[in-house]
Amino acid sequence: MNTLLHNKAWRVFFLVAVLVGLRSDLLFAQQIRVIATWPALADIARQIGKDMVNVESLATGVENAHGVPIRPSFVPKLNRADVLIVIGLDNEASWLPALLEVASNPRIAPGQPGYIDGSIGVSVLEAPTRFDRAEGDLHPKGNSHYLLDPVSGKIVAQNIAAGLARNFPQYQPTFQKNLTAYLAELDSRIAQWEKMAVPLRGVKFVEYHPEWAYFANRFGMKRIGSIEIKPGIEPTPNHIVNLVQQIKQEKPPLLIYGAQSPRFPEQIAAQTGIKVIRLYSSGGGRPETDSYIKWIDYTVRTLVQAVGGV
């Protein structure tokens, strides 16, 4: 009798395990396959899609924003994607178009419903009067680092919700519900960050790559110069000499760099005494920045602490 009961128990256990496994497989199969170019975009997509989406980011957050190293795994991911979310403004122009061509997925080609451009509706800063890559400028359509302004993050969330609903209209009410909740959370956090960032108002800084314009505009900081001559153009010796002289005259307390080499920041700091801070212009670069909200929070707190505000 005990053996019979034991065998029945194992059969029941096995049946339940199979059913649970099948349910998980079905759930995964039904999930919308989302590929984002950057971790911040991926996180916002997860907040909008919740359990309905399976989201992966191509970049990790520590790469040069305009030159993500291509990995073989990118192609099959793009080939299977239902939607692709990009920064836009040609941020990914140096590496993504070739990948899309090889991946050969018409659903996510530029201009198609599955291609979601996060920059739509963003108030673009530093937009040039004409489109020109002749001198290697990596911001030919304006500064693409808009996610450093959390108000722009709200616009991105709306774009992602609209893009998901465009491709999967049957789930539009769910996307809208999640969007509403996420925007409310962002509004609350933005109010907190603006209070927290009061010590940053009027603070001068130098950056390596021109990527902090949106953050500075939101929180009242003043950029006085960049190590790069133009976005993506490394400095000449004469440019460094002039920048060092400017720092000595204007005395900005901070030099911010991210994915770039520390060589020039350390060289400038040795000559001027300026404090060097490494902050990545996308979430995911540190464990504390694995969500969009955590990334902005970490960035605000780090800079406030750097100027002695906390």
What are these regions (language model features)?
Residues 11-24:
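Bacterial N-terminal signal peptides
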Residues 29-310:
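Extracytoplasmic metal-acquisition and chelation regions
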Residues 1-8:
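N-terminal secretory signal peptides that target proteins for export/translocation
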